[in-house]
């Protein structure tokens, strides 16, 4: 029998070579850079309910697709950097704890106590990370006008009523459809 043909073949096959088994390379990079990964976006509920993300606004401004005043831009940049610096610290802690668990599992030195402590701490850290990202989106509402928020949401493709029918420019269609539960 060939691997993958068994009734117990694993969707994790191939991931056993990861540096940290619980995290993909993209997840690790995102955590260490302060991005809103993993889990498909730490601020996804805010984003999909019309609360702009500072990184996306700044990207749209840089691309000439969106206008903000100089004062708004400075506030958005400051907000983004504050969020990013907090997220990096939390992300580094998550990666460190996940590494400890992975190493202990690999060396067969894991204890229930270490496992419990690290996993519970990782859970709390992910909660803090989500909060940092979500609060940042909420703070954007104090910086942007209602018209700007409406324009942002149109640029992001959140106005069709059916996100599966309106994939925003620059978004990979497969990833967009996956994140929006399109069939």
Please report, for each region that a protein language model flagged, where it lies by residue:
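Charge-rich (acidic/polar
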Residues: 2-183
């Amino acid at each position: 029998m060939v691997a993958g043909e068994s009734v117990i073949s694993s969707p994790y096959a191939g991931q056993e070579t990861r540096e940290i088994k619980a995290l993909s390379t993209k997840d690790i990079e995102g955590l260490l850079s302060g991005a809103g990964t993993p889990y498909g976006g730490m601020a996804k509920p805010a984003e999909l309910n019309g609360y702009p993300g500072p990184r996306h606004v700044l990207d749209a401004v840089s691309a000439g697709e969106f206008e903000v005043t100089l004062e708004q831009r400075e506030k958005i940049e400051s907000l983004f950097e504050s969020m990013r610096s907090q997220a990096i610290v939390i992300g580094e802690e998550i990666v460190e704890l996940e590494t400890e668990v992975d190493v202990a599992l690999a060396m067969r030195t894991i204890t229930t106590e270490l496992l419990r402590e690290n996993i519970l701490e990782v859970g709390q850290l992910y909660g803090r990370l989500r909060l940092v990202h979500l609060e940042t989106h909420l703070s954007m509402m104090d910086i942007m006008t209602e018209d700007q928020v409406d324009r942002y949401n149109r640029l992001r493709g959140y106005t069709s009523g059916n996100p599966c029918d309106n994939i925003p420019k620059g978004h990979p269609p497969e990833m967009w459809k996956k994140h929006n539960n399109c069939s």
